[in-house]
A protein has these predicted regions:
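Glycan-recognition and processing domains
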Residues: 130-200
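Alpha-helical cap/lid subdomain in secreted, periplasmic
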Residues: 1-134, 187-209
Length: 209
């Protein structure tokens, strides 16, 4: 919900529904739960009793597929309203016994924010554990344009000029492009601005990395 805070509503809905449908196509016995964290720009809406926009769009998907969700804002707001919590603190300051939830307005602190999230999630999981085990049958899509068929394709499968060099997985540059997910199967390198890759596709969205 935080990372999608300003994302287009349909992109959010298409992405979330695509994830759900991909998971249940692969294994209908997989249980899914949506988790909604929060950051400082959401506070005005939350204090007014409204879910933030990204949460509202994700909830349309959760409701349609009967997926449980956990909103971490509730316990945070309760402490904030009781003046027991500082949402964005300064690590160099003391706050007379109050819980410092974040130091940057987004990421919960280890000593203050994480225990609140842990309490919220633990309570919610105990509640969800009462539900009956069952397979999840896929029904007609809520959004026909969802990203259920989205996939990653190695760049080597596209037409490209001969100047590109396929990097070894032992190459440091290869590792630098992987990130935490280790998602890229191949990485090509070129120092010639005339080298090219041609991508032809049929669909509504394409990304090249």
């Amino acid at each position: 919900a935080v990372n999608d805070a300003k994302t287009d509503s349909l992109v959010i809905a298409h992405s979330m529904e695509g994830i759900v449908r991909k998971i249940w196509h692969h294994n209908p016995h997989t249980d899914i739960c949506f988790l909604y964290t929060l950051n400082e720009p959401m506070l005005d809406d939350l204090k007014a009793g409204k879910n933030y926009r990204s949460v509202r769009y994700m909830e349309t998907v959760a409701d349609y597929y009967d997926i449980p969700s956990v909103n971490f804002a509730d316990d945070v707001l309760e402490l904030l309203n009781e003046d027991k919590l500082v949402f964005k603190g300064d690590s160099k300051k003391e706050y007379s016994g109050k819980i410092v939830f974040t130091n940057d307005g987004t990421h919960p602190t280890y000593d203050g924010g994480h225990p609140i999230y842990t309490k919220t999630l633990s309570r919610s999981l105990l509640q969800m554990n009462k539900a009956q085990e069952k397979a999840h049958a896929l029904k007609a899509p809520l959004y026909p344009g969802n990203y259920e068929k989205a996939k990653m394709i190695p760049v080597t499968e596209f037409e490209h000029s001969e100047g590109w060099k396929l990097l070894s997985k032992d190459d440091k540059a290869f590792s630098n492009f992987q990130g935490d997910q280790k998602a890229l199967p191949v990485v090509l390198e070129s120092s010639d601005s005339e080298d090219f890759v041609k991508v032809h596709f049929k669909g509504i969205r394409v990304g090249v990395f």
